[in-house]
Amino acid sequence: MSFEDLIDLKAYLDSLPAVKNEVPPYELGFPFNIRRGLGLWHKLYVNGESFVPDPHASAELNRGAYLVTGPGHCTECHSSRNLLGGIVKDTEFAGAPKPEGKGSVPNITPSDDGIGDWSEDDIAYLLETGNTPDFDVIAESMAPVQENMAQLTAADRKAIAAYIKSLPPRPDAVPKSKQKDEDDEEGGAAKSGSDSGAKHPDVPQ
């Protein structure tokens, strides 16, 4: 995120009423309590550089890239991780196992496995309303994310949609056989977001 946006966030937090409460002690088990280990992990997996706009991309695409890779941090959930918890670059936006242990986070790249048959309007509409073009609704951990996305301007949601559609298409990071086994256990169908060509009647085509 930009320094200016971080300052704005701090200013907003400072404007909130103070709350007096007991804060539990900060405790982490081994090996996560080794601070030097966290520093090494940061060197391996955290890019501390500020966002640099692509001079060859449109203002809309650059705005979408900033929102998706910065405050939106979409790769944190929609990418697989290695044994150290670092994001596997080849799986960025291509989905991941859910951290709870069952189910998978969907592939949101414009591939056949992902949301290749969604339009930019479909994606923007999902962010605004929580409704997918496949007559489904956002649920579970994505629900509060969508509620926050609905607070964005229409232009920002459109920018996010444009950037998502510009991503390189990738196959599912979670094998479909594993997705099916997990869905069978949960008694539901996979909600990959690309299983149906049907469009929501209220989405502008």
Place the predicted regions along the sequence by residue.
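Hydrophobic, ordered structural segments
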Residues: 1-59, 65-67, 81-82, 150, ...
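Electron-transfer interface patches adjacent to heme c in soluble/periplasmic c-type cytochromes
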Residues: 1-4, 91-132, 144-158
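The canonical Cys-X-X-Cys-His
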Residues: 9, 64-67, 71-81, 123, ...
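Residue-level signal for pocket-adjacent positions within structured domains
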Residues: 25, 103, 137
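Electrostatic cytochrome c docking/interface patches
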Residues: 39-69, 112, 183-205
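C-type cytochrome heme-c attachment and multiheme electron-transfer modules
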Residues: 41-62, 108, 115, 125-135, ...
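Extended intrinsically disordered, low-complexity coil regions enriched in Ser, Thr, Gly, Ala
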Residues: 81-87, 117-122, 132-140, 171-182
